[in-house]
């Protein structure tokens, strides 16, 4: 056990922010704190590292109460990377990382050869050896974060606490930082506790997530168990977006406004199209989908009306009839370019029906493929080269 809390209350002055915190965090775990802004994630972290005194309860580092540890022992066991920018003046990267060796340098504070070796090893581990002679102030945000991680590594801690370590970083540096943290937990047995805002990254990187809301811990456990659609909706109170555990991310919900579009899709052909239409506030009906495929999950997450069948089931006549009825309520029908197999052949019937009814039918297929599938009817179709062209054309129809 690295960190244990018993009936912990954290806050400022006499005002509690989060109460009744009871946690048991193990060696080698990557622990993520998730919650809305102002929920108390940073307050919990600042209490764990003694920047704030607990308002009640206890924090244990190993078997020792936190307040019983000397500053020297605390520095040997715990490294901290906060969001507050540091202003190191003319210190270069090597000097910054060497600061992490200070708890190990003895009375004189003079680094030994072993300390220099560990600084170089820390820089290499975060892929920042090429930065060692540069001034810290010259670095990009992503490079600075890697250097601060190297400083934390140089301390050789059992626990690293980070406040929003991926904020202000581009996609590449976010992934790089999280992979470094994963390497620390798995390779060196270091416990990492970090506040995070990216639900999808927390789901993929963390061993444990702690959900914080309304002055209490809403849930704590593995992200696979805790980051369910319902719990994330409760945590963030999202009305115009939906988190999907199956997709591992957030989808914008389709909003009624610009008109109703029927999308004939399947086998992942519709997913990007659904997102594009939802972004432009079109109402979406889609089918006929198998409930085991990604198109079904994306359509469900964005709030589209779905005509579907169970996995690997044939499309029955009554399901086709329902889809045909809904097509009549749409001014535009889109063929997403779905592949044709034995189970989904009735979807071709949907497109032919829309063409016979004189509806506007668009397709993302090339003309030769459309002609093979729909025969002479294909001449009535509007062909779009990409999503931009499709969305532009559909918006003109509803103007």
List PLM regions with ranges.
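ABC ATPase nucleotide-binding domains
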Residues: 237-317, 335-336, 362-399
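Conserved ABC transporter NBD signature motif
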Residues: 57-65
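Catalytic Walker B motif of ABC-type/P-loop ATPase nucleotide-binding domains
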Residues: 160-164
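The feature captures the beta-strand-to-loop junction immediately N-terminal to the Walker
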Residues: 34-36
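Helix-to-loop junction immediately C-terminal to a conserved catalytic motif
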Residues: 49
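Conserved ABC ATPase "signature" region
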Residues: 98, 113-132
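Conserved catalytic motifs of ABC-family nucleotide-binding domains
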Residues: 156
């Amino acid at each position: 056990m690295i960190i244990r809390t018993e009936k912990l209350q954290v806050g400022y002055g006499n005002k509690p922010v989060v109460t009744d915190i009871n946690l048991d965090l193990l060696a080698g775990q990557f622990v993520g704190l998730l919650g809305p802004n102002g929920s108390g994630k940073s307050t919990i972290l600042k209490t764990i590292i003694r920047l704030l005194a607990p308002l009640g309860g206890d924090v244990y580092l190993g078997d020792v109460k936190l307040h019983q540890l000397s500053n020297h022992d605390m520095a040997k066991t715990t490294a901290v990377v906060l969001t507050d920018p540091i202003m190191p003046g003319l210190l270069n990267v090597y000097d910054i990382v060497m600061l992490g060796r200070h708890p190990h340098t003895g009375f004189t504070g003079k680094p030994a050869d072993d300390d220099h070796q560990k600084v170089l090893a820390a820089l290499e581990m975060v892929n920042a050896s090429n930065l060692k002679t540069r001034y810290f102030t010259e670095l990009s945000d992503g490079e600075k974060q890697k250097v601060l991680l190297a400083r934390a590594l140089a301390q050789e801690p059992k626990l690293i606490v980070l406040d929003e370590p991926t904020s202000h970083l581009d996609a590449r540096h976010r992934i790089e930082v999280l992979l470094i943290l994963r390497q620390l937990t798995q390779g060196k047995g270091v416990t990492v506790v970090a506040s995070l805002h990216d639900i999808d990254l927390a789901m993929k990187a963390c061993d444990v997530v702690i959900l914080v809301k309304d002055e209490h811990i809403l849930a704590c456990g593995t992200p696979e168990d805790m980051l369910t659609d319902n719990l994330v909706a409760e945590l963030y109170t999202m009305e115009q977006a939906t988190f999907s555990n199956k997709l591992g991310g957030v989808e914008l919900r389709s909003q009624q406004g610009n008109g109703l579009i029927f999308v004939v899709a399947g086998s992942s052909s519709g997913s990007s199209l659904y997102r594009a239409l939802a972004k432009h506030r079109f109402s979406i009906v889609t089918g006929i989908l198998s409930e085991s495929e990604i198109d079904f999950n994306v359509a469900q997450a964005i709030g589209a009306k779905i005509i579907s069948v169970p996995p690997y089931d044939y499309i029955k006549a009554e399901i086709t009839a329902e889809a045909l009825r809904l097509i009549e309520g749409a001014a535009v029908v889109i063929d997403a370019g779905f592949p044709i197999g034995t189970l989904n052949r009735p979807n071709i019937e949907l497109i032919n029906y829309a063409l016979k009814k004189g509806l506007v039918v668009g397709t993302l297929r090339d003309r030769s493929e459309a002609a093979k599938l729909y025969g002479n009817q294909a001449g009535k179709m509007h062909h779009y080269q990409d999503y931009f062209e499709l969305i532009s054309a559909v918006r003109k129809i509803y103007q």
